[in-house]
A protein has these predicted regions:
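Metal-dependent de-N-acetylase/amidase catalytic core
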Residues: 1-133
């Protein structure tokens, strides 16, 4: 692929994480859980300020959804995901993509990097062993 600026291909293991969907549901309204929860309480204020500073997003969302509703949504969703975690007050949720084609083994660098600020949902992981309904 052509990139700007040009860059050499990255020939190392890669892990892809999927964020929780808006509303914490699939497009068919099925509730979802994360495989991995990250404690965001220590950085929530910083995330809120960064989101508020995104001028074009702020303008469009204020007009389309109401004054600062997206900031309230950030707080509400972080609290809901925190509740789902059973451990954190405020959290983000992530699910790891199947490693085949991206890395030689089933690696989890986010968990390794964050240590105790990250928790794997054992129930979610166990459910992965069951056939898809």
């Amino acid at each position: 692929y052509d990139t700007v600026p040009p860059a050499a291909p990255y020939a190392h293991d890669v892990t892809i994480y999927h964020a929780m969907p808006h509303g914490l549901c699939t497009p068919l309204r099925q509730k979802v859980r994360a495989g991995l929860y990250v404690d965001v309480a220590p950085v929530q204020d910083q995330a809120r300020r960064a989101l508020a500073a995104h001028a074009s997003q702020k303008d469009w969302l204020d007009k389309s959804q109401g004054m600062d509703s997206y900031l309230h949504t950030l707080d509400k969703m972080s609290a809901e995901v925190g509740t789902l975690s059973g451990k954190y007050q405020l959290a983000q949720g992530w699910c790891r993509h199947l490693h085949l084609g991206y890395s030689a083994s089933d690696i989890d660098p986010l968990r390794s990097a964050l240590g105790s600020d990250c928790m794997v949902d054992a129930v979610y992981e166990a459910a992965l062993e069951k056939p898809f309904p």
